[in-house]
A protein has these predicted regions:
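Conserved small-residue packing positions in alpha-helical repeats and bundles
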Residues: 38, 73, 80, 87, ...
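Generic helix N-cap/helix-start motif at coil->alpha-helix transitions
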Residues: 26-34, 66-68, 170, 174-177
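Short, charge-rich amphipathic alpha-helical segments embedded
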Residues: 56-78
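Terminal, low-structured helical/coil segments at or just beyond the last alpha-helical repeat
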Residues: 161-162, 221, 227-230, 234-276
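Alpha-helical segment of the N-proximal tetratricopeptide repeat
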Residues: 32-53
Length: 276
């Protein structure tokens, strides 16, 4: 019995030594740790938390910074659009619901504030990418999020003036963010409005041409800048910042007819905003 106990003890010691000598987990607070946390939050459907981790990674220059910047351009752009679109749905409900419009108004304010935060993260990431990353091909170093490319059916409730139940509010928000992040990914890899094509691309390592990536980013910047228009948050300075970054991104890529047309469209919107 003593021999058996000794053998068991030796076996356990060898096992523990082998575990201890294996690959160690990243230290908390390091870029590798933050990257893993971003991936975990992303796959759990917590897009805003994933975005926060990506912002934290970019506080220093490290090996994860370029990947985090590319990911944030796609992620934060989708988050901003998701919050903004959902806010518009509640704004519609506020106009239609004459029983408790204030409840809808609170959601509008909260969602547009969250959209504004994500929009600024998105804008900053695009600015840094244009200035620091000359790559001709952009590697999308992340996989697809959970959720669906289809617009959530539950969105019809706030649009129509019916307040979602308490348990449905967060579920709708999560579904909406996932939906718009997927849309942002489609746009970034040149498969806009074609989720089937996007799914096939993500079966292997995904790279997209710089032109496609930055044209998509510029289009997203311009679309989301409407959040700061007079009939929404009425913040002309942020509108100007976003639209100018969109123009700068477009001017850094080959001047195709599409790029020139979008630049003209953005500059016309800037002139209209300045004239108010």
């Amino acid at each position: 019995m003593k021999i058996q106990a000794l053998l068991l003890a030796v076996t356990a010691a060898v096992f523990l030594a082998a575990c201890a000598s294996g690959p160690s987990l990243p230290e908390p607070g390091t870029p590798a740790f933050l990257w893993n946390e971003a991936r975990h939050a992303y796959h759990s459907g917590d897009m805003p938390k994933a975005n926060d981790y990506l912002s934290e990674i970019q506080q220093t220059d490290n090996s994860f910074t370029p990947r985090a910047r590319i990911w944030q351009i796609v992620l934060a752009g989708g988050i901003a659009r998701g919050y903004s679109d959902l806010a518009d749905a509640y704004a519609s409900g506020e106009r239609l619901n004459h029983t408790d419009p204030l409840a809808f108004h609170r959601h509008v304010n909260e969602l547009r504030a969250s959209a504004s935060h994500a929009a600024m993260d998105f804008t900053q990431a695009v600015h840094a990418f244009v200035a620091r990353d000359p790559s001709t091909d952009v590697q999308l170093g992340f996989d697809l999020p959970p959720g669906s490319a289809l617009e959530p059916v539950a969105l019809r409730k706030p649009y129509g003036g019916t307040m979602p139940l308490e348990g449905e509010v967060l579920a709708l928000q999560t579904a909406m963010l996932e939906h718009d992040v997927i849309g942002s990914i489609c746009l970034a890899n040149g498969s806009a409005n074609d989720s089937a094509q996007m799914l096939s691309k993500f079966k292997a390592e995904v790279t997209t041409p710089r032109f496609t990536f930055l044209y998509a980013a510029a289009k997203n910047l311009f679309d989301i800048s409407g959040l700061f228009a007079l009939n929404r948050l009425d913040q002309p300075q942020k509108f100007q910042v976003m639209t100018q970054e969109a123009v700068s991104a477009l001017q850094s890529i080959p001047q195709t007819d599409d790029a020139k047309s979008l630049i003209k469209k953005i500059q016309a919107a800037q002139k209209r905003a300045a004239a108010r």
